[in-house]
Amino acid sequence: MQVVNVATLPGIVRASYAMPDVHWGYGFPIGGVAATDVDNDGVVSPGGVGFDISCGVRLLVGEGLDREELQPRLPAVMDRLDRAIPRGVGTAGVWRLPDRNTLQEVLTGGARFAVEQGHGVALDLERCEDGGVMTGADAAKISDRALQRGLGQIGSLGSGNHFLEVQAVDRVYDPVAAAPMGLAEGTVCVMIHTGSRGLGHQICTDHVRQMEQAMGRYGIAVPDRQLACVPVHSPDGQAYLAAMAAAANYGRANRQLLTEATRRVFADATGTPLDLLYDVSHNLAKIETHPIDGQLRSVCVHRKGATRSLPPHHHELPAELAAVGQPVLIPGTMGTASYVLAGVTGNPAFFSTAHGAGRVLSRHQAARHTSGEAIRASLAKRGIIVRGTSRRDIAEEKPEAYKDVDEVIEASHQSGLARKVARLVPLGCVKG
């Protein structure tokens, strides 16, 4: 029903799309994609982005570090990561911002500002969506409450399904694409999944309320109040997009800071540098140009729980990846595989694909009959080390709470949304 409701939004073009990992969400389904024609009454809807604005994934690749080489040191590495990575609801981050002026630099500069402050290298930005910074951000469109929530959380995982996972490449499907990505069987990687924390949540909350009140002024009626929306070109629409871009930059800076904390752990424990393969959001609305009915049109592409998947030779790709397409990072669960895919030509859903396994059990249902300690012990028997803030958090994220990620990936591959490059298996997980 949510996919159908999205199809009624003013200005929608082509279709309302559901990705293979689709499940129920706020307004839009999680795993939903829709584009609206911004010059023909197209709207923007915060429900099409979600509360965790710019929640996304980045993958770090261990330069010359093999799974067998890491194995004896893995417990020590996980203990160090456990201490180095802040997480949990309301947790303070690794970077203590001195004042709101510095926060505003983060909101407008994203990962680029973090790198300029010494938290990374210039090459990192070449491997980030939009070069690590989304233009159009305006902190003046953000409430004091949202700013206050963002001030102390930069550089932290948060809670829920967010994580930092040490992985190893288990299988390579496409050696030609895997080579420039630095992926070979046995290669150690680190996947980071988090977003814009309390700041993004508050921005969504604030602008949903504003749009609920504003829709009448624009003559808009929606079948579900959670689909509150306004025209992209309206003052309300521009205010949301400016605030959303600021949250996107916060999320990108957040992952950049966690990257540096992780690099320090690996440098100290293994002497191995970690190179950034790619960083991409899966909760975002972006103004893009796409062919619609034979003409190039400016559209607002909502991707909620959906990963951008650019094809080979797209102008936004770094030169060394242009021939193979954008790396698409799709995490599984604590006990299952994650995947690296690549974008393909002809993707019908505005170059979008899945973002994860997709929930089948609510958090309450997942935790009802299982203890976090039992899950931790079960994973330990399989050689997977788990570090979590609470037993309930671990129970809520048990593998059985999600769809079979292998089936989600196969559906993405077979339907022409992306192609398989490599399969990664978990070695250790720091849970948010």
From Swiss-Prot:
Induction annotation: A member of the dormancy regulon. Induced in response to reduced oxygen tension (hypoxia) and low levels of nitric oxide (NO).
Active site: 355
A Pfam family matched in the record: RtcB
Positions that bind Mn(2+) 2: 55, 193, 282
Positions bound to GMP: 161-165, 282-283, 331-334, 338, 355-358, 431
Cofactor comment text: Binds 2 manganese ions per subunit.
Catalytic activity: a 3'-end 3'-phospho-ribonucleotide-RNA + a 5'-end dephospho-ribonucleoside-RNA + GTP = a ribonucleotidyl-ribonucleotide-RNA + GMP + diphosphate; a 3'-end 2',3'-cyclophospho-ribonucleotide-RNA + a 5'-end dephospho-ribonucleoside-RNA + GTP + H2O = a ribonucleotidyl-ribonucleotide-RNA + GMP + diphosphate + H(+)
GO molecular function, one term: metal ion binding
Reported cofactor(s): Mn(2+)
Keywords from the named record: GTP-binding, Ligase, Manganese, Metal-binding, Nucleotide-binding, RNA repair
Gene Ontology process terms (BP): RNA processing; RNA repair
Enzyme Commission number, as recorded: 6.5.1.8
UniProt: Mn(2+) 1 binding residues: 52, 55, 162
Subunit note: Monomer.
UniProt similarity note: Belongs to the RtcB family.
Role according to the record: GTP-dependent RNA ligase that is involved in RNA repair. Joins RNA with 2',3'-cyclic-phosphate or 3'-phosphate ends to RNA with 5'-hydroxy ends.
Note: Ligation proceeds through 3 nucleotidyl transfer steps, with 2',3'-cyclic phosphate termini being hydrolyzed to 3'-P termini in a step that precedes 3'-P activation with GMP. In the first nucleotidyl transfer step, RtcB reacts with GTP to form a covalent RtcB-histidine-GMP intermediate with release of PPi; in the second step, the GMP moiety is transferred to the RNA 3'-P; in the third step, the 5'-OH from the opposite RNA strand attacks the activated 3'-P to form a 3',5'-phosphodiester bond and release GMP.
Protein name: RNA-splicing ligase RtcB
Organism encoding this protein: Mycobacterium tuberculosis (strain CDC 1551 / Oshkosh)
